[in-house]
């Protein structure tokens, strides 16, 4: 039995059902463990309460920061394959190219990721 954590959301139900079907077709029993937010799911993953976490980029960063050992991404939805990222800087900023970010701290995430 694989315990897969996810954040409970009506918009995620179709994805949850699709993942459950995918696992069952491969002979893997799946137990969904739903959380009210990404922080709770990250803590559960680090504690070993769930085997996998279904989250976005910021959820990954949260888990990676909490873990003392590396974690890895093992799957991505096909709808995310062609995603692009845009970096936007103020016109009066000294940032003109990605190289200008060297030595700076910044964060980004998708609008659907907490």
PLM region descriptions:
Residues 63-75:
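Ligand-binding "clamshell"
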Residues 31-43, 96:
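Short helix-initiation/N-cap motifs at beta->coil->alpha
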Residues 2-26, 35, 83-114:
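Bilobed "Venus flytrap"/periplasmic-binding protein-like clamshell domains
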Residues 29-31, 72:
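Conserved beta-strand segments of alpha/beta enzyme cores
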Residues 43-44, 62, 100:
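Well-formed, non-transmembrane alpha-helical positions, independent of function
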Residues 40, 59-60:
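Alpha-helix capping/helix-boundary segments
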Residues 46-55, 69, 104-107:
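Alpha-to-beta junction loops
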Residues 74-84:
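Short Pro/Gly-enriched coil loops immediately N-terminal to beta-strands
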């Amino acid at each position: 039995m694989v315990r897969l954590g996810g954040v409970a959301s009506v918009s995620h139900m179709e994805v949850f059902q699709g993942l459950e079907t995918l696992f069952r077709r491969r002979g893997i029993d799946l137990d969904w463990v739903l959380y009210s937010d990404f922080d709770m799911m990250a803590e559960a993953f680090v504690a070993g309460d769930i085997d996998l976490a279904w989250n976005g980029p910021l959820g990954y960063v949260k888990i990676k920061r909490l873990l003392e050992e590396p974690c890895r991404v093992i799957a991505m939805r096909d709808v995310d394959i062609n995603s692009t990222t845009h970096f936007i800087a103020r016109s009066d900023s000294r940032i003109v190219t990605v190289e200008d970010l060297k030595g700076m701290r910044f964060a980004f995430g998708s609008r659907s990721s907490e």
